Amino acid sequence: MRIEALNTAPDATEVRFEEQIRPQSMSDFAGQKKLTDNLKVFITAARKRGDALDHVLLSGPPGLGKTTLAHIIAAEMGGGIKITSGPLIDKAGNLAGLLTSLKKGDILFIDEIHRLAPAVEEYLYSAMEDYRIDILLDSGPASRAVQLKLEPFTLVGATTRSGLLTSPLRARFGINSRLDYYSPELLQSIIVRAAGILNIGVDEDAAMEIARRSRGTPRIANRLLRRARDFAQVANEASISLAVARRTLESLEIDEGGLDDMDKKILEAIVRKFNGGPVGVASLAVSVGEEQDTIEEVYEPYLIQVGYLARTPRGRVATRLAMQRFSYPGMQDHGPLFDHNS
């Protein structure tokens, strides 16, 4: 499988780590069983017909395995993969260069596809539907359009904000799948597997402690595993024990529920500064000193999932659970409150 990374690369250490532990097949991919079972069927059928796989849209919070699935799809279809992201394709010409370089059966993976420029997105429509693009030669009165045929390919788009996709783009994906947060038990198995590949000793109860505080996210679980390894090595421990895991998590200020410092700042701001809400996300971002997009894409989904936050037409509102935990003594409750399961 050919891999060409066109996006801004992470640091070398992160790349080596991800390459070492990345599952190589659908069978190796932990969790998301219904999604992977369906993809196995679609891939097998496409290969039997000798066709390119239908275009695939993968949505869900960051760190759940969308990029890994794109690599697995490429491997199981027997093609190469080109990797880029929506913000990097700022001109139709850039997209044309990518599309014309694809070979039959290749995968084009576009991360953050919801951030494609409108002109670039429209250029993608004919490529997805008919495997062709129109290129404008020259400019002014002498300009003319030339149609180029493309090799059959599969576009795999990944998004953390599926609601921002336009209807015409969404309609062109034949396969639309959403990834959900992982259970602590699944994350524990992912941690144990990664530790085995990296030759890191980890006790089962330590792996579960890390899993419980990983926000249901494999990327976070693997990152915390690496940090726990650091603490174990500095303490001259042969493996990551429960005590080492807890010391690591406490040092990183990650609480029993997986909330980190920014999670707590967000909830404390809503509860204490805005009296439980509602508050607009722009005001909230200014209050905690974080980018609005980061709050919406990284922090909010998990806080909603675990019942601390609710979205309403008027803004973000702390649930009763959040009010009980983050209210200061003597604080009065005003405004609408939501039970965590409402």
UniProtKB/Swiss-Prot annotation:
Positions annotated to bind ATP: 21-22, 63, 66-68, 129-131, 172, 182, 219
Keyword terms: ATP-binding, Cytoplasm, DNA damage, DNA recombination, DNA repair, DNA-binding, Hydrolase, Nucleotide-binding
Region listing for Large ATPase domain (RuvB-L), in residue ranges: 1-182
Reactions performed catalytically: ATP + H2O = ADP + phosphate + H(+)
GO biological process terms on file: DNA recombination; DNA repair
Subcellular localization(s) per the UniProt record: Cytoplasm
Main location: cytoplasm
Similarity comment: family membership: Belongs to the RuvB family.
Assembly: Homohexamer. Forms an RuvA(8)-RuvB(12)-Holliday junction (HJ) complex. HJ DNA is sandwiched between 2 RuvA tetramers; dsDNA enters through RuvA and exits via RuvB. An RuvB hexamer assembles on each DNA strand where it exits the tetramer. Each RuvB hexamer is contacted by two RuvA subunits (via domain III) on 2 adjacent RuvB subunits; this complex drives branch migration. In the full resolvosome a probable DNA-RuvA(4)-RuvB(12)-RuvC(2) complex forms which resolves the HJ.
Function: The RuvA-RuvB-RuvC complex processes Holliday junction (HJ) DNA during genetic recombination and DNA repair, while the RuvA-RuvB complex plays an important role in the rescue of blocked DNA replication forks via replication fork reversal (RFR). RuvA specifically binds to HJ cruciform DNA, conferring on it an open structure. The RuvB hexamer acts as an ATP-dependent pump, pulling dsDNA into and through the RuvAB complex. RuvB forms 2 homohexamers on either side of HJ DNA bound by 1 or 2 RuvA tetramers; 4 subunits per hexamer contact DNA at a time.
Comment on protein domains: Has 3 domains, the large (RuvB-L) and small ATPase (RuvB-S) domains and the C-terminal head (RuvB-H) domain. The head domain binds DNA, while the ATPase domains jointly bind ATP, ADP or are empty depending on the state of the subunit in the translocation cycle. During a single DNA translocation step the structure of each domain remains the same, but their relative positions change.
Descriptive protein name: Holliday junction branch migration complex subunit RuvB
